């Protein structure tokens, strides 16, 4: 489940400066850690306002919580900038989402969707709170152990994972290089508008799990 990152407890200058600039112009911001693994945070940033563009999303994964926060905020702000630049006079359909196929479509949808129920749910739900701090043990400190745990988790959910440690002994003290292949997740095309292969088990479809378009599906 997601946890809310307490933006008011950060002592990092980069985080404080970004949040101050956003709040200063009357926008709302919420940061959520949506990662399943505490060693590697995945930060979702939601910025919303009372005028166009109504909402923008940014997401970042990093072994450093602070880096993930800063990158997700930067992405969300960039989306708002692009929304201003690419604004269209055409009204978007907020009831039928068949037209939402590519990433720019998601940008236009949430930029034009005033009082979006999914945005309001993200902004108002009472998530458990965590501080915006570095994790005490990062993936880079014990990568092989973490990879073994992750491979085991994916295997129980029907995903075969093949990986190999490619790190040269003389540079191991600087970090680790691993090659990872998950056949079921390899896209048939690198184009952004082509769906990735998912689990072949008879799980509920995305439309049943979440009726709203999601740029990170």
What kind of feature is each model-predicted range?
Residues 1-217:
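Helix-biased "structured C-terminal domain" signature
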């Amino acid at each position: 489940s997601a946890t809310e990152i307490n933006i008011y407890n950060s002592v990092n200058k980069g985080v404080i400066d970004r949040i101050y600039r956003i709040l200063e112009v009357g926008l709302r911001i919420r940061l959520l850690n949506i990662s399943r693994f505490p060693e590697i945070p995945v930060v979702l940033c939601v910025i919303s306002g009372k005028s166009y563009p109504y909402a923008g999303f940014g997401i970042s994964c990093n072994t450093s919580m602070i880096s993930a926060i800063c990158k997700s905020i930067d992405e969300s702000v960039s989306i708002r900038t692009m929304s201003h630049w690419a604004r269209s006079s055409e009204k978007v359909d907020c009831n039928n989402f068949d037209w939402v196929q590519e990433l720019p479509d998601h940008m236009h949808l949430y930029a034009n969707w005033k009082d979006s129920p999914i945005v309001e749910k993200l902004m108002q739900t009472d998530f458990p709170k965590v501080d915006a701090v570095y994790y005490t043990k990062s993936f880079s400190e014990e990568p092989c152990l973490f990879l073994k745990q992750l491979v085991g988790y994916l295997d129980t959910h029907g995903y075969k994972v093949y990986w190999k440690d490619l790190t040269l002994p003389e540079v191991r003290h600087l970090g680790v290089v691993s090659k990872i292949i998950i056949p079921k997740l390899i896209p048939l095309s690198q184009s952004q508008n082509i769906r990735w292969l998912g689990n072949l088990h008879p799980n509920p479809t995305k439309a049943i799990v979440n009726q709203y378009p999601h740029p990170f599906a």
